[in-house]
Amino acid sequence: MEDKIKSFLDLVRERNGDEPEFMQAVEEVAETVIPYIVNKNIYHGKNILLRMVEPERVISFRVCWVDDSGEIQVNRGYRIQMNSAIGPYKGGLRFHPTVNMSILKFLAFEQVFKNSLTTLPMGGGKGGSDFDPKGKSDNEIMRFCHGFMSELFRHIGPNTDVPAGDIGVGGREIGFLFGKYKKLKNEFTGVLTGKGISWGGSLIRPEATGYGTVYFAQNMLATKKDDFKNKIIVISGSGNVAQYAAEKSIQLGAKVVTMSDSSGYIYDPEGIDSEKLKFIMNLKNIERKRVSEYCVKYPNSIFVKDETPWSIKCDIALPCATQNELNINDAKTLLENGCICVSEGANMPSTKDAVHEFQKAQILFAPGKASNAGGVATSGLEMTQNSLRYNWTRKEVDEKLKDIMMEIHNSCIEYGSDNNGYVDYVKGANIAGFVKVADAMLAQGVV
């Protein structure tokens, strides 16, 4: 079996060159899915996984825009249309200087499995640019977004490819992108998700990824007859996902003690309550300042520069910042400090070695493709509402989100349980996501 996995990975590596993030994502899937394929005659000779790791389409383009000083700037734009076997391509746009082909291919590949797990008819894709929105004026961001959409518009559509937000792309950017698309196409359609409520958005969409991460952890804890009440929670990040993961944790009676950004983390031993969280939301969403400002307002807290929060003692860890933020040493520290549950809010925030450490200890560990699928699930619900020209209530969307996260959890248990009662959620998520897409690809022939 190891030889089969190695030969497959060698072939993918040879085809894709130096793309470490993409290879990390493929390796994780191959380790669990190839043994499953070997035992299922229906997939023999079809090269299904090899077809899944090859994008259906890779789009790269130039984005020119004018900054506030009148100088022309040039960035690169991308869209990876990975797999459309079960629905139109669906996945976010990321604006960040680190964006490259490897990162977007990894995100698009993960998105295929994540979208499959939601039970909704969505394929997988991802896109973005190496543009850095930090320090830019609203007008500069608008001009960049309009330049970006001037090329992207010809490759997307409500039945073809429906982008959304990601790191560096929030409600403001989605608004600029949608406005330009509407102008270019002269039509009002659900071509983007994450829109404002008054122009086609869905209630709960901003909260969905963070809420879903917590709902998934709730489902895992329930298998041990446990819950969030009085648990100590360590959260990384302070963006959208982290904010709403914190909000839902607080609502469930837990004590959130950390949040972070790229400058370091804050630790509040008294706990970040609802009032303090509102301060952080205003700090990050409106004032766009560093999380360290929290310690000026609340002097009983401390700020640790250039570090991640995984050394803080906790019951539950929710990594909600970015890929590979939690390494094997962090995993060992969390385990030594008594952590019983890790639910990934970001995409692939734990390194491969860290994941193996959690699995070896047999704690509750949820991979991002399962636990943070609430965001894209609610994007799917937004697409449904756009098609119906109708809006569900906040309660209706939240209930649907809870149901979807429970279904994802049940699928992970179905494919990830061993004979001793341990649930390998990584294995379960990979196989459950694979089966739906693979069966659709078989049914549609060689295309």
Map each language-model feature to its residues.
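Conserved active-site and cofactor/substrate-binding residues in soluble primary-metabolism enzymes
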Residues: 3, 17-24, 28, 43, ...
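Buried hydrophobic packing segments
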Residues: 33, 104-107, 177, 213-221, ...
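Structural motif
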Residues: 78-79, 121, 128, 160-161, ...
